[in-house]
């Protein structure tokens, strides 16, 4: 779903950019095509620009993640053939099956590589266009490599917890998670968390929290801001797209819409840097995962009728 949305977004924005963009310097880099291609072929723009270390890193993560996912999917298929029944892949993120989790983690790694490569390409392109008057709203110039490194390191910066824009949303999700764990839900029972729950939840949350910020707030929102509308409108539009991209996992992504808007607001307030947003996003997901894994559907109970023997 998310790739379909991204393809439509890129097509529409390309049309808008062509019709509205003014003259740019000859050495200005592509802020739409190169980042877009790098999303689907991680490292492409970096190989082209001669940034070989970054290119190798993005391509390597992409290949490694894709291989992990493919191996896990093959294992799932073999097990299903041997058992003659489905493993339960429809549970998605709620599944505790090792192969299902490896498949999802590998897929997330591959997607993250594309988002990091996209941010890297876009940041360099935006900086190359500043002398033509574009992207002046983005604050001080940073290289694409620096932007990516800042984003992937952000979830470990606990200093963000001193900001009300960080501890309030995390406090809200924490309180809701605690209530969910302690309350009794019909059809569900509380279960102890396993080490694998912590490991998968943390790894998946880290990848989602960093690469989705790179994609939605690091590339999409400033593009909309430059070619379509101002700060508020660009934030609203990106948060709507962010929510729609999560329709595959939730029926009504209202929390994602609100979170996306807050993360966009924080990003704009911080000079269009992604650090605080990546911190909030990552730990929001960690808390949500741990709360979800603390409950499981009650096992089916077979109620047999009483046995009556009549002589």
PLM regions with names:
Residues 36-81:
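N-terminal, post-signal-peptide region of Sec/Tat-exported proteins
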Residues 205-207:
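Detector for outer-membrane/organellar transmembrane beta-barrel domains
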Residues 60-72, 81-88, 235, 239, ...:
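Short alpha-helical interface elements
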Residues 76-100, 186-191:
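Flexible, solvent-exposed loop segments that connect beta-strands
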């Amino acid at each position: 779903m998310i790739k379909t949305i991204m393809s439509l977004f890129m097509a529409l924005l390309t049309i808008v950019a062509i019709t509205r963009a003014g003259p740019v310097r000859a050495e200005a880099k592509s802020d739409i095509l190169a980042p877009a291609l790098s999303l689907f072929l991680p490292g492409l723009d970096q190989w082209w620009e001669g940034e070989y270390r970054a290119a190798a890193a993005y391509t390597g993560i992409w290949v490694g993640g894709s291989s992990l996912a493919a191996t896990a999917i093959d294992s799932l298929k073999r097990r299903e053939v041997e058992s003659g029944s489905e493993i339960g892949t429809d549970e998605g993120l709620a599944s505790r099956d090792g192969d299902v989790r490896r498949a999802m983690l590998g897929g997330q790694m591959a997607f993250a590589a594309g988002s990091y490569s996209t941010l890297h390409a876009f940041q360099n392109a935006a900086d190359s266009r500043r002398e033509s008057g574009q992207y002046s709203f983005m604050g001080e110039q940073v290289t694409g490599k620096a932007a990516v490194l800042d984003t992937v390191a952000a979830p470990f910066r606990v200093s963000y917890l001193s900001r009300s824009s960080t501890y309030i949303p995390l406090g809200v999700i924490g309180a809701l998670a605690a209530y969910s764990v302690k309350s009794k839900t019909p059809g569900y029972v509380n279960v102890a968390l396993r080490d694998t729950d912590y490991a998968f939840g943390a790894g998946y949350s880290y990848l989602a929290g960093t690469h989705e910020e790179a994609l939605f707030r690091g590339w999409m929102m400033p593009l909309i801001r430059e070619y379509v509308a101002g700060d508020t409108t660009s934030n609203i539009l990106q948060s709507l797209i962010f929510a729609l991209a999560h329709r595959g996992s939730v029926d009504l992504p209202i929390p994602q819409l609100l979170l996306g808007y807050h993360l966009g607001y924080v990003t704009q307030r911080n000079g269009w840097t992604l650090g605080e947003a990546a911190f909030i996003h990552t730990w929001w997901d960690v808390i949500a995962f741990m709360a979800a894994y603390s409950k499981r559907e009650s096992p089916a109970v077979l109620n047999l009728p009483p046995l009556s023997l009549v002589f």
